[in-house]
Regions:
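Elongated, amphipathic alpha-helical interaction scaffolds
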Residues: 1-285
């Protein structure tokens, strides 16, 4: 029986999408909010290390980076855990890609859009069932007024359900590929194998195609994910406990303040009543 690796791991994700242009084009066209006229037809891979323009700036590395025949840039990230720091890194990397296009003496009008596709194996928007979140720079009162340049797509993989986007066949197939295949998979659904690019991607996930060193790196990746998840859970639990303690302390303090205030008011009322009684007695004497 054939065994498979999980496509979401760093090793497998880069192997599947980092050196196969047509496969990456299929993924991008399926998951990004591109109109028919905006579809990608050809790409060229770019180095995944983003070097800063200024000396002393911060170098960053992304999973997959490419440009198309129009000069548009596409940055793809597979992230196992959500954090505010990751969100800021996404913004930082996309901005750096946009700025890096500027050439000395060049025109700003020649700058091409940057699309950032982020696949998150975590839930970060808990108050909505929507799992695809597209962002761009729009007017706060009229969303039809757009400043072109930066486009962000975040997909919460755990929320994905095929029936919710049944009309988008390729999106469904690629998201099923990312969410349904793992080390426990015994049989690959026929509709995944029937698509040429996804079928080839499935073949590359066969465990027999990896070296012992690659398999060790694969296992190490999941160990690090487990450790990171534990640390995040511990921080979350600690934050809840601290918040609870602060809430109790604040409640006690507020209760004491109210008690003292009520006591003082009651004491003043009693004191005034006693004083009025004494005055009345003197007047009757």
């Amino acid at each position: 029986m054939m065994k498979y690796l999980d496509p979401k791991a760093d090793l497998t994700f880069k192997k599947i999408f980092g050196n196969h242009p047509q496969r990456l084009i299929s993924l991008l066209n399926a998951l990004l909010p591109l109109s028919e006229a905006e579809q990608i037809h050809a790409i060229e891979y770019l180095p995944t290390e983003l070097v800063p323009q200024l000396e002393g700036g911060k170098n960053t590395i992304v999973d997959v980076l490419c440009t198309d025949s129009r000069g548009r840039k596409f940055c793809v990230e597979m992230q196992m855990e959500w954090s505010d720091a990751f969100q800021q890194r996404v913004l930082f990397n996309a901005s750096k890609l946009y700025v890096s296009q500027a050439k000395k003496g060049g025109k700003y009008s020649e700058l091409q859009p940057v699309y950032s596709l982020n696949l998150i194996n975590d839930v970060f928007e808990h108050d909505t069932p929507d799992f695809i979140h597209n962002y761009r720079i729009v007017h706060d009162k009229d969303s039809n007024k757009v400043i072109e340049g930066l486009h962000f797509t975040f997909i919460e993989l755990p929320k994905f359900t095929p029936h919710s986007i049944a009309d988008k066949r390729m999106m469904v197939l690629w998201l099923r590929f990312l969410t349904e295949i793992n080390s426990n998979t015994k049989e690959i659904p026929a509709d995944l194998l029937n698509d040429p690019e996804i079928g080839k991607a499935v073949e590359e996930l066969e465990i027999s195609g990896f070296t012992d060193a690659e398999l060790r790196a694969y296992d190490k990746f999941w160990d690090s994910v487990s450790v990171e998840r534990t640390l995040l859970d511990d921080r979350y639990q600690k934050g809840r406990e601290e918040g609870k303690e602060e809430g109790i302390a604040e409640g006690m303090e507020k209760g004491m303040e109210q008690g003292m205030k009520q006591g003082m008011e009651k004491g003043m009322e009693q004191g005034m009543s006693q004083r009025s009684l004494e005055i009345a007695k003197k007047m009757l004497a």
